[in-house]
Each structure stands twice: as C-alpha cells, then as structure tokens.
C-alpha cells in the first residue's frame, strides 16, 4: 500500500459539531459524527490535534475508553454508542486548566462558529 492510500484510509482531520467545557464534571463534551466501529478514525486525529499521547485503548460492546496523556496530565477520552456521547475527562480538579487549554485546540476543529462555550 502506498502512502497516498494510507492517508485516504486514515483521515488527518476531524469535524466537531460542538464542544463544551463542563467545569463541574471536569470534562469536555464533544458532539461529532462518530462511527463506533471506526472510532480510531475519529480518536487518533483528535489525539494528534490535542497533542496528546494515546497510552491505552479499551473497548467493549458499546463503549470506547482511551487513556490520553497531555504533558503529564492523564485524561480519558470516552465514547458510548447507545447514547452517542463523547467526552474527555480528568479525575483531577487541578487539570481543569488543561481542559480549558484543550478547548482552545478544539475550536479550530469546529464545523461552525459559535459551537462552543
């Protein structure tokens, strides 16, 4: 397979419809068209765009959960099929600043202006 074919099978960009920081839940809610069976085609470009290292990938019948590292902060990227819900979360209140910064990296990925808070 040549590199052109590889690029076509693994998109470099993603489109996010909406992203919202939830300070109380220590998370970023993401609304996008995500295919559960091809989650990596959404998650890998998102991790690259956020300059995150993928440390671990877990999945089950209706859920994906990836452990991400951003400059020493551990974050979880979640996607649940039945609720069609995606979010990035931290368990550490101090990392809310990291989520706030990641929102600045997500904004260029938004499909329409005004789709973030």
Regions found by a protein language model. Name each.
Residues 2-59:
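Negatively charged, low-complexity tracts enriched in Asp/Glu with abundant Ser/Thr
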Residues 23-24, 61-64, 83-84:
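Short acidic/glycine-enriched loop/turn segments that link adjacent beta-strands
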Residues 67, 73-106:
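Short, compact, well-ordered microdomains
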Residues 1-10, 50, 55-57, 93, ...:
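Acidic, proline/glycine-rich low-complexity IDRs
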Residues 48-76:
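Amphipathic, interaction-prone secondary-structure segments
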